[in-house]
């Protein structure tokens, strides 16, 4: 949290809840994938949330990652340079986010720049990178490097084609939502509180 003081009360509870969502095992998987995918001497950080954040904070690793998912000459981020200036780092992070959105990640799955730069929500950063990896595996264009089992499998379209005869038969079936004339019924039941009549 670079520019913010400590949070108190409800803000502190919310921040602690967000920090509990961070997964150290997932961090190791993501580091392994990023270093495998980038190949260009990307160093591996020490384990830990802060080290992971500092590794990604300047945006160069993220830009190298998104560029490695595109064919040669079609890289979305043209200029990648390490910088110590805050606005340059944030600009590179936002370039990665724009390129990730063009790659196919939903806007709802993308973290905000401050989530990474200030370390406010590193779990959201992990989710974005997981979605990016899963999408790269699903594309199956030969540009993904690493183990496809690191990421959840994306579902693929599976259309069903029914003949006119099958569609017509489906109209004749009475759905269970309409009710059924079999099974238990209320025949012989008495109202609540009435005594049993034994004859």
From Swiss-Prot:
Start-end of each Calponin-like repeat: 174-199
Assigned protein family: Belongs to the calponin family.
InterPro entries: Calponin-like, Calponin_repeat, CH_dom, CH_dom_sf, SM22_calponin
Residue numbers bearing the Phosphoserine modification: 11, 163
PTM-bearing positions, type N6-acetyllysine: 17, 20
GO molecular function, one term: actin filament binding
Descriptive protein name: Transgelin-2
């Amino acid at each position: 949290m670079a520019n913010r003081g400590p949070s108190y009360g409800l803000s502190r509870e919310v921040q602690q809840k967000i920090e509990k969502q961070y997964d150290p095992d997932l961090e190791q998987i993501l580091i392994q994938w990023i270093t495998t995918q980038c190949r260009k001497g990307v160093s591996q950080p020490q384990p830990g949330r802060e080290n992971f954040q500092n590794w990604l904070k300047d945006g160069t690793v993220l830009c190298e990652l998104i560029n490695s998912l595109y064919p040669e000459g079609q890289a979305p981020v043209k200029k990648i340079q390490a910088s110590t200036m805050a606005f340059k780092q944030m600009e590179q992070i936002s370039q990665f986010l724009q390129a990730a959105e063009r790659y196919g990640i939903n806007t709802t799955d993308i973290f905000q720049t401050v989530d990474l730069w200030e370390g406010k929500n590193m779990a959201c950063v992990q989710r974005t990178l997981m979605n990016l990896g899963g999408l790269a595996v699903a594309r199956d264009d030969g540009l993904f490097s690493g183990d496809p089992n690191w990421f959840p499998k994306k579902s693929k379209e599976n259309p069903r084609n029914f003949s006119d005869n099958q569609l017509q038969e489906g109209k004749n079936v009475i759905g269970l939502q309409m009710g059924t004339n079999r099974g238990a019924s209320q025949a012989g039941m008495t109202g609540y509180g009435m005594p049993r009549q034994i004859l």
